[in-house]
Curated annotation (Swiss-Prot):
The protein's name: C4-dicarboxylate transport protein
An annotated GO BP: L-aspartate transmembrane transport
Family the UniProt entry places it in: Belongs to the dicarboxylate/amino acid:cation symporter (DAACS) (TC 2.A.23) family.
InterPro entries named in the record: C4_dicarb_transport, Na-dicarboxylate_symporter, Na-dicarboxylate_symporter_CS, Na:dicarbo_symporter_sf
Keyword Zinc: no
Chief location bin: membrane
Annotated source species: Escherichia coli (strain K12 / MC4100 / BW2952)
Length: 428
């Protein structure tokens, strides 16, 4: 029993995170030097994301009997994303108004260091809706894979899958090659995941070593407000959706606990993307659904990021005593409904989208970003964790809506009654 516990990735990552926190706290200079370990692990994962998405989407679409099903799945997924992310924005808005973490700070925007956030504000100017849509279309296929742009790779994979499906039996050889290549890719993922404890240790040691516990205490009310909101969203909103779909959110969280710990250690939900693709398929969701919903969700279904954006924007307004009546808050909500959809595939994405939102709203000081620059890293964990759980739930819900969910397999796996690989007939 003890041997199996020590060998489990869950235990190893959890232990690595704890050691990283202790090292960063007691030996901050050494902790900061551990940054390459975390960065290296995330880069290894990002290296494999593009081929994983390509193989999963192509084999999923090309293996379907009807192309109409793909379009239906995409439409249902986008509808679900819009509804749930809007709920996330509204919940964030309600909680931050009730708690008011920025009230009483009385910060003069003129005293803030605008230079500290200038790089984010400059990048935000390029994050318009048209620019976002145009960015989905790659200048070249090789460029899309080289840059690791998820949506660009997804677009090419969907087109490739459609074209391969139209070839029929003539394309069977290509289909078999891609399917075999997919197995090799997942073999590489299994090797990379053995390094997860090292990556989690390095990332956590760096974070605590560089920013320290004092940063947490300084703006602790905002951090606590954000974490509580994320927990409430997962338990109440996603929990209710899960219950209506026929599964327990807590059992699902237990099922993806290793992925959650990896995300906690690296603060990047992308670090768990390859394993989530595999795990959601083993949970009973059709490969074509998983291949469309998970990658698309990384741009259109970022529930944690949506909560962060509303709370951070209103916090800045409260801290700087900027006017924020009901009209301004509705305006903020409308702007965020659009700007939050561009939060993926951009370095410092949440922060950049927040800068773009403050600029678009107009009456909120962009320099106010300096208030949360130091603690943004500590809130990124909750963002990434909530995003991951949200995309997992979305995959199951969409699979059920389009009747591509194996209910028996879902129930068996979540209740530990069957091996992950066992198959059952689909039910509607």
């Amino acid at each position: 029993m003890k041997t199996s516990l020590f060998k489990s990735l869950y235990f190893q990552v959890l232990t690595a995170i704890a050691i990283g926190i202790l090292l960063g706290h007691f030996y901050p200079e050494i902790g900061e030097q551990m940054k390459p370990l975390g960065d290296g692990f995330v880069k290894l994962i990002k290296m494999i994301i593009a081929p994983v998405i390509f193989c999963t989407v192509v084999t999923g679409i090309a293996g379907m009997e009807s192309m109409k099903a793909v379009g239906r799945t995409g439409a249902v997924a986008l509808l679900y994303f819009e509804i749930v992310s809007t709920i996330a924005l509204i919940i964030g808005l309600i909680i931050v108004n009730v708690v008011q973490p920025g009230a009483g700070m009385n910060v003069d925007p003129a005293t803030l260091d605008a230079k500290a956030v200038a790089v984010y504000a400059d990048q935000a100017k390029d994050q318009g809706i048209v620019a976002f849509i145009m960015d989905v279309i790659p200048a070249s296929v090789i460029g899309a894979f080289a840059s690791g742009n998820i949506l660009q790779v997804l677009l090419f994979a969907v087109l490739f899958g459609f074209a391969l499906h139209r070839l029929g039996s003539k394309g069977q050889l290509i289909f078999n090659v891609i399917e075999s290549f997919s197995q090799v890719i997942f073999g590489i993922i299994n090797m990379i995941m053995r390094l997860a404890p090292i990556g989690a240790f390095g990332a956590m040691a760096f974070t605590i070593g560089k920013y320290g516990v004092g940063t947490l205490v300084q703006l602790g009310q905002l951090i606590i407000c954000f974490y509580i909101t994320c927990i409430l969203f997962v338990v109440l909103v996603l929990g209710s959706i899960a219950k209506a779909t026929g599964f327990s959110i807590f059992k699902f969280i237990r099922y993806i606990r290793e992925e959650l710990l990896i995300v906690l250690g690296t603060s990047s939900s992308e670090s768990a993307l390859p394993r989530m693709l595999d795990k959601m398929e083993k949970l009973g969701c059709r490969k074509s659904v998983v291949g469309l919903v998970i990658p698309t969700g990384y741009s259109f279904n970022l529930d944690g990021t949506s909560i962060y954006l509303t709370i951070a924007a209103v916090f800045i307004a409260q801290a700087t005593n900027s006017q924020m009546d009901i009209v301004h808050q509705i305006t903020l909500l409308i702007v965020l409904l659009l700007s939050s959809k561009g939060a993926a595939g951009v370095t410092g994405s949440g922060f950049i989208v927040l800068a773009a939102t403050l600029s678009a709203v107009g009456h909120l000081p962009v320099a106010g970003l300096a208030l949360i620059l130091g603690i943004d890293r500590f809130m990124s964990e909750a963002r990434a964790l909530t995003n991951l759980v949200g995309n997992g739930v979305a995959t199951i819900v969409v699979a059920k809506w389009v009747k591509e969910l194996d209910h028996k397999k879902l129930d068996d796996v979540l209740n530990n009654r069957a091996p992950d690989g066992k198959t059952h007939e689909l039910s509607s």
